[in-house]
């Protein structure tokens, strides 16, 4: 009887051990098997205005009202009436909205940080923000900020403690976090805006891929293992791009989008998809997800009325009337001198939830939510994994 009891106890212990190991593996973000949610403790984002939650506003002055009116009730560093796709990503993962790394007031970095700034590009711009509108915070600068953030946050976290442990991430979060990238749009548009030909614009794409690869590998070298990489959207459907280069507005598709702009965006995306596949082979211990936001955005624009939206090329927060309700010299919240008085003329439309374009460059919150809903389940991703399972997207 004693021998039987011992055997039974041993069997139970073995079963419990196996169950414990299985549970531990299931809860590890680093597990590569098909399984449950990844439980990312933080998100670190790199990008441009499509995901900027306050970087440029912290540097050069806040995005003015009516930006932020729909969700935040006030300007919140976003060039939008409300939330961006990156905000919906954070919410979906059960995390707080990301604070901009450059914002020194009221920020909390416990669950990540945002290095994106509006106007940023992969390559450094050979001009200034005030001349071109493009940010000096290129992708390599964003990575330098990220390195500084790791080093300085952990120095303070470990040596000062106290309140700092409530606003800074744990050291292990840097290897467990999801790293998101949404950048490249400004490299294409800025090249066109200096009157380059399509052939000249296309010629920079290989260099963009090399630079992007280098930065992603640098993030990998600092512990990053889970990457969620957005492609660029249909640039030929952005009113500001069409006004900057009206010669490229024709030929247009049935929606009024520039065929030329969009073909270059599609070429960029093709090369980006190849780049992500190459990274996947180079680093088989990491998870790289390529996310096709182009398809989500073009679906919204080309089927706007069917999906409950108004004219997708008509700017909500703009000025000037005309085809796009956009004057390039007057942005959203912008002012003009009227009879010697400075008057706000860049006003919001009555119902932003019915519009796709917020300010001629960026989407409304409603449009961003549509895009997020299209990508969150993984139907537009390669590999086709959901956001919450992006730690499982390893491939050969």
Swiss-Prot record:
Report the SUPFAM superfamilies cross-referenced here. Cyclin-like (SSF47954), SGNH hydrolase (SSF52266)
Q: Which domain of life is it from?
A: Eukaryota
Looking up CDD domains in the UniProt record yields: SGNH_plant_lipase_like
Catalytic residues (UniProt): 49, 359, 362
Q: Name one GO cellular component term.
A: extracellular region
Q: What is an annotated GO biological process for this record, any one?
A: lipid catabolic process
Enumerate the subcellular locations listed in this protein's record, separating them with semicolons: Secreted
**Predominant location of this chain?**
secreted
UniProtKB keywords: Glycoprotein, Hydrolase, Lipid degradation, Lipid metabolism, Secreted, Serine esterase, Signal
Q: Which residues are glycosylated?
A: 108, 126, 151, 196, 339
Q: Which residues form the signal peptide?
A: 1-31
Q: Care to name a GO molecular-function term for this sequence?
A: carboxylic ester hydrolase activity
According to its UniProt record, the EC number is 3.1.1.-
Q: What does this protein do?
A: Esterase that can hydrolyze acetylthiocholine and propionylthiocholine in vitro. Substrate preference is propionylthiocholine > acetylthiocholine. Possesses extremely low activity against butyrylthiocholine.
Instruction: Write down the PANTHER family for this protein, in alphabetical order.
Output: ALPHA-L-FUCOSIDASE 3, ZINC FINGER FYVE DOMAIN CONTAINING PROTEIN
Q: Which family does it belong to?
A: Belongs to the 'GDSL' lipolytic enzyme family.
Record protein name field: GDSL esterase/lipase ACHE
Organism, as annotated: Zea mays
């Amino acid at each position: 009887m004693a021998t039987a009891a011992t055997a039974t106890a041993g069997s139970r212990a073995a079963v419990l051990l196996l169950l414990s190991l299985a549970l531990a593996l299931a809860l590890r973000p680093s597990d590569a098997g098909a399984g449950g949610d990844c439980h990312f403790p933080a998100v670190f984002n790199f990008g441009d205005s499509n995901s900027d939650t306050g970087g440029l506003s912290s540097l050069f002055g806040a995005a003015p009202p009516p930006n932020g009116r729909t969700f935040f009730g006030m300007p919140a560093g976003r060039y939008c009436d409300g939330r961006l796709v990156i905000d919906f990503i954070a919410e979906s993962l059960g995390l707080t909205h990301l604070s901009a790394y450059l914002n020194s007031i009221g920020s909390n970095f416990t669950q990540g940080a945002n290095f994106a700034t509006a106007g940023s590009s992969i390559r450094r711009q050979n001009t200034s923000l005030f001349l071109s509108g493009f940010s000096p915070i290129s992708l390599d600068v964003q990575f330098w900020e990220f390195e500084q953030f790791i080093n300085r946050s952990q120095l303070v976290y470990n040596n000062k403690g106290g309140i700092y442990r409530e606003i800074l991430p744990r050291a292990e979060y840097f290897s467990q976090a999801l790293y998101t990238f949404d950048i490249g749009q400004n490299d294409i548009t800025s090249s066109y805006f200096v009157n380059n030909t399509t052939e000249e614009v296309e010629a920079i794409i290989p260099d963009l891929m090399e630079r992007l690869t280098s930065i992603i590998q640098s993030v990998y070298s600092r512990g990053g293992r889970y990457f969620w990489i957005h492609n660029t959207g249909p640039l030929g459907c952005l009113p500001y791009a069409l006004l900057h280069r009206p010669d490229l507005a024709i030929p247009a598709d049935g929606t009024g989008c520039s065929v030329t702009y969009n073909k270059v965006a599609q070429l960029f995306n093709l090369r980006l998809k190849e780049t992500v596949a190459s990274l996947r082979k180079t680093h088989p211990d990491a998870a790289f997800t390529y996310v096709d936001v182009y398809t989500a955005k073009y679906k919204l624009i080309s089927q706007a009325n069917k999906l409950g939206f108004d004219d997708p090329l008509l700017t909500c927060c703009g000025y000037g009337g005309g085809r796009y309700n956009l004057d390039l010299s007057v942005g959203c919240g912008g002012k003009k001198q009227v009879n010697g008085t400075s008057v706000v003329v860049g006003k919001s439309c009555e119902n932003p939830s019915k519009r796709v374009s917020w300010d001629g460059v960026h989407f409304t919150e409603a449009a961003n939510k549509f895009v997020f809903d299209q990508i969150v389940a993984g139907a537009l991703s390669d590999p086709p994994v959901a956001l919450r399972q992006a730690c499982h997207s390893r491939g050969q």
